[in-house]
Amino acid sequence: LSAFTRLFCSDIGGRRLAGWWTRQRRSYFVLKLPHRWWLVGSDGQLQSDLDVPQMEHFRDIAERHMQAGDKVILCLSQPVWVYAQKYRNMGRVFDETDLIYLREEVYAKRGIDVKVYLTGDLHHYRRHEETRESAGTAEPVQKITAGGGGAFLHPTHEDDFSRLREAAISEDVRSRTFEVCATYPSTAQSARLAWGNLLFLFKNPRFGVVPAAIYLMTAWLVGAASGGVSPSNP
């Protein structure tokens, strides 16, 4: 996060960037919403932990402004619940303890509930809902992947994520289970689209011609710029 902070959030060297003036002072935020809801935007980059200043900022906001009974929508950089399941199936571990710590130590101990997890990264839509057995009498937690704004579509049929398990990290934190409630595209539609890639050359024949021309021109320009000099043998 230090590089992002230095470029976009620091007064050192000015805040102008491409004709714009940056105003943010951190890469994460907390926004108060109506009806006692809060929007919390964390910055874990990709496969990185929430750093200490970020965690302390969330703790400070919770202590000074939030109240017991408030609810949180937590925005993440990636669907850690999906990656944790995928790693578990491969016999590996995907560390999600920082998010569990944020939920349990920063919010839950103050009576604040994280009810919605919202992320992108994977370019499709998938919503997991906490099972009734796991939620008990409480309102089920929602975990939503909404990455439809990506330049391409990620498949939804490659692995089975119909049921997820969030492991307990201590005796005080219970394990939780989630079931998929909605997916777009559906697994069947995703599989059909994947098989359709075999016909891509016939569906879009110009796509192969254009990159080939660009690569050829690039190679010619590089060769011309270097004067056609090749390294001599020793």
Where are these regions (language model features)?
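Extended active-site neighborhood of metal-dependent phosphoesterases/phosphodiesterases
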Residues: 1-73, 83-182
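A cross-family glycoside hydrolase active-site/sugar-binding cleft signature
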Residues: 75-77
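Acidic, metal-coordinating catalytic cores used for nucleic-acid/nucleotide bond scission
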Residues: 80
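Non-catalytic terminal accessory segments
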Residues: 89, 170-234
